[in-house]
């Protein structure tokens, strides 16, 4: 298949409906792709005019729209019955089309069965119309023999464009600019713009829901359409810098005594260069100081070269230093015709000896895949959204983003340059549904494969992306697309990419499905490979090369963050010890949920299927580290600690600091050292630990543990890495990472129930139906017939609505459902819930205490017996022991959770606990800080799209559940017992299990306290197949024991 240096674009004076189903026609009259450099006319005149704002729109069926005669594009067309829509925006979000979410399958599947490149008959067209007057600045440029272009920065899926009734052009690939020259249309349209800049013009767009391009855009996202990015006019002077291509290389010194050097090479393409005399170029640092300048004669192709420069600070995510190149085009009369500015970061990114390096250092991507999404605006996100996302990344130690699976808005790249994020820039292409059906893969059937009719469109897509984004230092890797199998078309794309850019690596994961096309990627990239599978590659190589790895490895998607997920992430970060392991990208960044107002005025975060869209993949759109409203999910806590560049190991006599930064020492951070006595801070100091990048060092710490040991059950020694100074994304003192160790104290773990030590003025009553213990204003009542403690009061306050019941299950997580957990462990869903009490033994324990022991049979065929034992004394202390002996008989599945669930009055909604936090933790997601944390039952119920298991806290020593007046119950681990797991939620496990949306959960009428001996992990390898890892499961043949002390206050 032949490559073309530049893509051939159809030129036409009238529109053709045939283009919609012709993959060889992907644009008509579109200008060649070019860099997104900034420019002004002269020195200050802004060249652009925004056409954003309110447009008119009407939806038609495609069969009723004739784009060739296009009567709707006439200036005098009657559009009084059109509706209003904001641009940028989506037709679906504005209510004009139905929201549709599918993952792999195409949205028309089952309704129609078109064969590519054909499209469904049920195809909508949005006729957009907008009237505008040309800004005076742009009219002046036209008057001076300049040009004006019209750019659609994002439009889905295909657009036909008319200006004043004149056909302007056609465009696909909605995620890169469709730019059209409208100079003549403006001059010849409704009024002469040069003479009458206030003349009104009429812009008409026919935006199609489906075209042949739809086959290339089968990404896992909401299928949203319309003009969803900025629409603008831009004027260009007669002599104009059309494109800029920069190489800003940085070379680190390789021998002692030599200097680091940087060199700038820039290629500028000028239109009408004969009308200019000179090019003046200036490079300035962030303080405005000139570091290089030149003046040279003007011709068509301008080559700038700075030569070797010293004292240039390199760009990296750790230290994103930017310089500004200013280029002035000077006319023969000495006047400045145009001024171009471009931010520059000097850096070199290469694959050296099989390892990706930046500025000579091995890089590890601590990344996430990011869809552009907002719950209210869809993919029409704002600058504020983008800045919020960048700040989240920096605060959570995320250093890289893959623009999955399309080029992002241009401003995103500016932010990543400025704040420091590495990017894999991905071509707008996914054809997953063409080669996967009913979970059966047929990669040879994939589009585009080796079909020559698709080559032009696919090569054009990567060409448009690369030309636009080339100059951004944050872009380290080009990606050919996502989940589109492989074939000769990808070889053409790969060759074209390296023709434009021989330096950056090219990435593509799809070749793993067709190993004969391994040559289309410079990186071994896989999705959802388990850690052990990755390790095999790092040791042995790929199936095609079993003599060791030949390419650096990344997981372009891993840690499927759907719902309550991201367990066992540490198994992946542990692979960083292999030089050719270079990190991964968590799928994905933000939940794709649409905030929808319900008839009763409330709102719901809706997922697939909620709009009557079928087929649908329902809640599979909820895979984010952020919830759809951009609040961090509890999973982010784990990611932040595991992605930290500074690792801290604490012991009783030192702190060991490992600095995994590549370029930045730890000298500018402050390290706060604390001692916590049973979670309470009792000692603190601040130290400076200066460790060079890539190095480790141990620092002696004289912890005054002996001063606090006698009055504590345990001490926590903590070192916190914090920002020493405020920066653009966080204040001074913001914590980036921490390390802790636990030292035993001298106090006993808990006050055991002691009949001899209990007050003698209390009473113990052994009745025929109940046994009661009363003292110090507290009373506990144990039923002989109802299987447990049926009352626990302090004064007039009752804390037991129903006796605490055995639980052996948990609400299913998304990962549980995907791995078949419900089917495999269905027995445990009812084993505890429907357990029956088969024995009760109540007796005095001394004079001032009572012991009540209940034996339950679990509702499983083995009828395994579980013991629930209470010991209560007249001091108001209740000891609770719940024992599962382990069941050797039969092949029982592992247990989801084991302990008790206890319904409390609704007012007891506040939780304060000493354990791992502050966010929820699980057996395989517990890289959290040990401390005392405060929250509420409502706040602890994470708003996962599909209600599920949530709110668990591991390693809990004690917890206090209180009302707003401070009254409540304290739960503490028993004497000699291990820490327990617990949660306090406004909903029972059954309620969470049954609801399909958060708003379907009932108004809280009780609080549900769950005390657990243990709970299985949540998993995270994927959400459709992989179970929780064995070491984080609870084998049914092993005993489990919960031992806690209760006291009301």
Curated annotation (Swiss-Prot):
Residues of the active site: 483 (proton donor), 557 (nucleophile)
Gene Ontology molecular function terms on file: beta-galactosidase activity; carbohydrate binding; metal ion binding
Temperature and thermostability: Optimum temperature is 37 degrees Celsius with ONPG as substrate. Retains 60% of its activity between 20 and 45 degrees Celsius.
Residues that bind Mg(2+): 430, 432, 483
Pfam family, one: Glyco_hydro_2_N
Domain of life: Bacteria
Activity regulation behaviour: Activity is inhibited by EDTA. Activity is abolished by Cu(2+) and shows 59% reduction in the presence of Mn(2+). Lactose acts as a competitive inhibitor.
Documented applications: Possesses the industrially desirable properties of high substrate affinity for lactose and low product inhibition by galactose, and is an ideal candidate for dairy industry applications and prebiotic manufacture.
GO CC annotation terms, alphabetical: beta-galactosidase complex
Keyword Nucleus: no
UniProt site positions, description: Transition state stabilizer: 371, 405
Record's keyword terms, sorted: Glycosidase, Hydrolase, Magnesium, Metal-binding
EC number: 3.2.1.23
Required cofactor names: Mg(2+)
Record-level GO BP terms: lactose catabolic process
Record bears the keyword Hydrolase: yes
Field pH dependence: Optimum pH is 7.0 with ONPG as substrate. Retains 60% of its activity between pH 6.0 and 8.0.
Gene3D superfamilies, per the entry: 2.70.98.10, Galactose-binding domain-like, Glycosidases, Immunoglobulins
Free-text comment on the cofactor: Mg(2+) enhances the activity by 30%, followed by Ca(2+) and then Zn(2+).
Catalytic reaction annotation: Hydrolysis of terminal non-reducing beta-D-galactose residues in beta-D-galactosides
Similarity section: Belongs to the glycosyl hydrolase 2 family.
Function field: Catalyzes efficient hydrolysis of lactose. Also exhibits transglycosylation activity to produce oligosaccharides at low concentrations of glucose. In vitro, acts on the synthetic chromogenic substrate ortho-nitrophenyl-beta-D-galactopyranoside (ONPG). Acts exclusively on terminal beta-linked Gal residues.
Identification of the protein by name: Beta-galactosidase BgaC
